[in-house]
């Protein structure tokens, strides 16, 4: 498979060249809103998935095709949880050759482990998932591996922050199907205040989630959570993410390969694909062909059409592990 993809426009990281370092779908969580689909292999065991040399080569080849296109970050964002990769530290060391800042987007679930904390200290930017610090809501949203303990994860985040010199951000997903109590919102905000990241991002689902019952929250729910976060953490630290990143995706000469690499982790809206293909003077027929060949699937969410690589985690027959 293609490990490096993009760059893709990111609402947090600018132009991000993605590194899909975990196959579909090894993860410690099975989040109800995950755009990659349901977790097939729920695990907390770290191991090698790809060799560091293969990851380096894939990034090197991808950068070589971009004609000096600006890249803001090399970002470990995968079909699963990137800290499951036991070679993270070596990979970051090798990727320093490109002189581009390196980021990781993690669900935070393994941060209680000292080896994981040490491995990600060398990233320029670390993004932690903190959907809720309320035990019941955490289990309902993130559906964690049976051996994970929320308190240990939260303690691990604080321990990491005490030693980290880079930029730390957090992301909190707000869902329409969750009954947030004021107490649960306050608890999460108070934890984030203690964690003291550079920025706390609030997000809502904008792409097809793994579970069809997941809907965007009502505006009054967003407003309430935003008000509590602003009061406890401070307005300067909080940012509510907008609807979509934009359409500044980068294609190489192999458009089909690029579409499959991007949509493996990042479902693309139909209108964005059409615009990108038009810029490259390529007919939309290529998308219809990929759907007919079973390479892509067509999804609908919140009144919009998306296309995604046909991966096993999106199979409706996949059950929760």
Swiss-Prot record:
UniProt KW keywords: 4Fe-4S, Iron, Iron-sulfur, Metal-binding, S-adenosyl-L-methionine
Family annotation (Gene3D superfamilies): Aldolase class I
Cofactor: [4Fe-4S] cluster
Annotated S-S bridges: none
GO molecular function: 4 iron, 4 sulfur cluster binding; catalytic activity; metal ion binding
Domain Radical SAM core: 11-236
A Pfam family per the record: Radical_SAM
Record flagged with keyword Mitochondrion: no
Stored SUPFAM superfamilies: Radical SAM enzymes
InterPro entries named among the record's database cross-references: Aldolase_TIM, Elp3/MiaA/NifB-like_rSAM, GTPase_Obg, rSAM
Presence of keyword Endoplasmic reticulum: no
Binding site for [4Fe-4S] cluster: 27, 31, 34
Comment on bound cofactor: Binds 1 [4Fe-4S] cluster. The cluster is coordinated with 3 cysteines and an exchangeable S-adenosyl-L-methionine.
Family note: Belongs to the UPF0026 family.
Stated name of the protein: UPF0026 protein MJ1312
């Amino acid at each position: 498979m293609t490990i490096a993809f993009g760059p893709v426009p990111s609402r947090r990281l600018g132009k991000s060249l993605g590194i899909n370092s975990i196959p579909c779908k090894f993860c410690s969580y099975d989040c109800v809103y995950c755009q990659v689909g349901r977790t097939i292999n729920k695990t907390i065991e770290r191991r090698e998935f790809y060799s560091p040399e293969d990851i380096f080569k894939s990034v090197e080849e991808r950068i070589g095709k971009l004609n000096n296109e600006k890249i803001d970050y090399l970002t470990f964002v995968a079909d699963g949880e990137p800290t499951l990769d036991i070679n993270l530290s070596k990979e970051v060391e090798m990727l320093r050759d490109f002189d581009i800042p390196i980021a990781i987007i993690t669900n935070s679930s393994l941060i209680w482990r000292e080896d994981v904390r040490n491995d990600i200290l060398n990233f320029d930017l670390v993004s932690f998932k903190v959907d809720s610090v309320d035990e019941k809501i955490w289990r309902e949203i993130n559906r964690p591996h049976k051996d994970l303990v929320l308190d240990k994860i939260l303690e691990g985040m604080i321990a990491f922050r005490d030693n980290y010199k880079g930029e730390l951000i957090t992301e909190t997903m707000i869902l329409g199907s969750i009954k947030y109590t004021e107490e649960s919102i306050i608890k999460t905000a108070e934890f984030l205040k203690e964690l003291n990241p550079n920025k706390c991002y609030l997000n809502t689902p904008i792409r097809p989630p793994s579970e069809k019952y997941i809907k965007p929250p009502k505006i009054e729910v967003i407003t309430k959570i935003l008000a509590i976060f602003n009061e406890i953490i401070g307005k300067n630290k909080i940012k509510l993410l907008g609807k979509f990143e934009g359409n500044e995706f980068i294609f190489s000469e192999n458009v089909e390969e690029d579409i499959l690499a991007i949509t493996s982790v990042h479902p693309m809206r139909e209108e964005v694909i059409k615009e990108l293909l038009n810029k490259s003077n390529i007919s939309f027929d290529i998308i219809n062909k990929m759907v007919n060949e079973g390479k892509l699937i067509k999804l609908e969410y919140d009144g919009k059409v998306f296309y995604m690589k046909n991966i096993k985690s999106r199979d409706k027959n996949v059950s929760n592990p």
